[in-house]
């Protein structure tokens, strides 16, 4: 990883590491079953998608593990940013925390009494708050994460990513309300792994929507929210290109350009 960081720096590229939490963690959970609720033995995923096996916010082992990971990342990556993930945490979201004994004990300790599953988002808030504090106080890093509409409170100074197709306006309004910065990468304009034309699907796909060159270029970075939003909240614009359906470097370039220009 150090070689990659050094190589990128030669071309004035800053590499920002992302460690997903609490979802998209099956590889780590497979090796360390103590990371998930019930300490389940979880097989490695061989296909893309969303897993219901999440990091357990009620287990101190989770925080020990993440602390070790972030310590190593902070040493390897000079970037002032570290991405915490936060998206696609199960179907329904965070559901495996509902009946977990460790999670129940944490809810009791935090005084959480609701039982409509909103309590699980408060556990996610607790998990993120602890990790955000670690990144800021120990390593001087600015936390980033994917915005989900049920994640109501965003710590000031964090950078959220607006990505979900059709929910960009809500994400931007949440950033303004929480005095947070936001990276604009809406699925309807900026997902470069989506095909540019009907019938031009990658060999492996899940029925992706089409994002034409015209759609990409029609992106309004301020999303109609005006100059104050651009000045105070807009962090930037990102094109996302996930490799789960990409089987060659040539396909990466084909998908990225000219839409990324």
Language-model features: where?
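Substrate-binding cleft of carbohydrate-active enzyme catalytic domains
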Residues: 1-141
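Flexible, acidic glycine-rich loops studded with aromatic residues
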Residues: 143-261
């Amino acid at each position: 990883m150090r070689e990659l960081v050094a190589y990128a720096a030669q071309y004035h590229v800053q590499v920002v590491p992302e460690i997903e939490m609490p979802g998209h963690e099956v590889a780590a959970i497979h090796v360390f079953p103590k990371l998930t609720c019930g300490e389940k033995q979880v097989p490695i995923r061989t296909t893309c998608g969303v897993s219901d096996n999440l990091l357990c916010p009620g287990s101190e082992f989770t925080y020990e593990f993440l602390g070790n990971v972030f310590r190593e990342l902070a040493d390897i990556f000079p970037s002032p940013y570290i991405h915490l993930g936060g998206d696609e945490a199960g179907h329904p979201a965070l559901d495996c925390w509902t009946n977990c004994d460790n999670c129940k004990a944490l809810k009791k300790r935090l005084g959480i009494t609701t039982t409509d599953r909103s309590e699980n988002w408060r556990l996610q808030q607790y998990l993120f708050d602890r990790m955000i504090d670690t990144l800021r106080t120990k390593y001087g890093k600015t936390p980033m994460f994917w915005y989900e509409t049920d994640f109501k409170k965003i710590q000031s100074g964090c950078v959220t990513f607006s990505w979900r197709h059709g929910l960009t306006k809500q994400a931007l309004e949440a950033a303004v309300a929480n005095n947070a910065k936001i990276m604009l990468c809406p699925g309807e304009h900026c997902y470069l792994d989506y095909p540019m034309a009907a019938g031009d699907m990658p060999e492996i796909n899940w029925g992706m929507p089409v994002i034409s060159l015209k759609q990409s270029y029609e992106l309004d970075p301020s999303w109609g929210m005006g100059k104050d939003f651009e000045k105070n909240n807009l962090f930037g614009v990102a094109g996302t290109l996930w490799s789960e359906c990409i089987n060659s470097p040539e396909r990466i370039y084909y998908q990225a350009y000219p839409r990324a220009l």
